[in-house]
């Protein structure tokens, strides 16, 4: 089916397969977490909402993230760590550091990234302890954190690791090189993208990382991803166009607002919001006004609501923010975390 997401060679993203719908919906990177399957729209949904003051939701959002850091589900813990980093919740970093001892490697991976993303210098000592971790991906995340904390020598470790035969390691390294802003790694990323032995997850992550580094030569590759018959590949291309951020990339994103799959439209709206363009607002509102989650199964509804919340966080318009109170009280933990992130992001913009 056109809207069925392809699972390519254990395709992954910044939240392992067991994460189900991680908040980033990254088609690339972390722990080979993949883009989940996309379903077509239904009818029925969340209904009308009144205008709200985003400040009224802030404490509720903070508590959701705080509680989620201690959740029994490792996917939820990972999602919460990501939100801490994405929204700059520096007060929660000590709790994130405790998760360096988590039994699940993806949680430790995300915790190391958070230290680097927030450039939390007080965490350097504990990050170095992760070099003893049994998981190679966690060690690489520790290298990323140290680079962000000023130890550029660890870049060389990451550059060498992209040649790994382990496709998950290779994809994660591509992701980390992009996050490091290492333009000297462009040649390596092109190699990884073009190598015949690279899995799809490596190819798509390398493409996104090249876009993150601002190399507009990647545009034709990203455009072909937008033309894919597979919705998950289109979503990956959309994320990469958002990372590239050129005028041509923005125009490409605008064209994806007409996609027949709701998740693809939401991804395009979110990435336009990333570029401070609110053109996609009607596509997000349509989830509520046309009740697009009605008729979906539980997982499909959760997925659409997570992506809706993510788009709201990027766009942060009053007409969208008013729907956050319902999303933040959704029965799904993943939706509540996504809504909490949207609240915190919206507050930063308003």
Show which residues each predicted segment covers.
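C-terminal motif of bacterial Sec signal peptides marking the signal peptidase cleavage site
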Residues: 31-34
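Bacterial Sec signal peptide processing site at the extreme N-terminus
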Residues: 36-53
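Amphipathic alpha-helical scaffolding segments comprising HEAT/armadillo-like alpha-solenoid repeats
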Residues: 37, 57-68, 89-101, 120-132, ...
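Short inter-helical turns and helix N-cap capping residues of alpha-solenoid HEAT/ARM repeat scaffolds
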Residues: 72-73, 103-104, 134-135, 165-166, ...
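Solenoidal tandem-repeat scaffolds enriched in leucines and small polar residues
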Residues: 165-240
């Amino acid at each position: 089916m056109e809207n069925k997401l392809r699972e390519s060679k254990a395709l992954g993203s910044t939240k392992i397969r067991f994460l189900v719908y991680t908040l980033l919906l990254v088609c690339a990177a972390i722990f080979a977490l993949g883009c989940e399957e996309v379903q077509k729209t239904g009818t029925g949904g969340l209904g009308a909402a009144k205008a709200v003051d985003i400040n009224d939701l802030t404490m509720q959002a903070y508590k959701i993230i705080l509680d989620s850091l201690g959740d029994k589900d490792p996917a939820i813990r990972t999602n919460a760590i990501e939100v801490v980093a994405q929204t700059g919740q520096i007060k929660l970093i000590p709790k994130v550091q405790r998760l360096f001892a988590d039994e699940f490697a993806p949680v430790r991976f995300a915790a190391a990234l958070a230290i680097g993303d927030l450039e939390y210098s007080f965490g350097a000592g504990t990050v170095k302890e992760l070099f003893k971790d049994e998981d190679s991906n966690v060690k690489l995340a520790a290298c990323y954190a140290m680079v962000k904390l000023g130890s550029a020598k660890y870049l060389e470790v990451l550059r060498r690791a992209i040649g790994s035969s382990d496709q998950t390691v290779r994809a994660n390294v591509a992701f980390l090189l992009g996050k490091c802003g290492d333009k000297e790694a462009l040649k390596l990323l092109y190699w990884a993208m073009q190598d015949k032995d690279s899995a799809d997850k490596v190819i798509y992550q390398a493409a996104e990382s090249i876009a993150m580094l601002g190399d507009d030569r990647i545009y034709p590759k990203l455009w072909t991803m937008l033309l894919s018959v597979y919705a998950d590949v289109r979503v990956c291309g959309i994320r990469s166009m958002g990372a590239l951020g050129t005028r041509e990339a923005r125009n490409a994103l605008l064209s994806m607002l007409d996609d027949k799959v709701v998740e693809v439209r939401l991804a395009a709206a979110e990435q336009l919001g990333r570029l401070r363009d609110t053109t996609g607002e009607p596509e997000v509102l349509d989830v509520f006004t046309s009740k697009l989650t009605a008729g979906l199964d539980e997982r499909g509804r959760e997925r659409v609501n997570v992506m809706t919340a993510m788009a709201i966080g990027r766009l942060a318009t009053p007409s969208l923010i008013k729907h956050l109170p319902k999303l933040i009280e959704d029965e799904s933990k993943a939706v509540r975390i996504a809504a909490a992130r949207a609240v915190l992001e919206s507050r930063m913009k308003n």
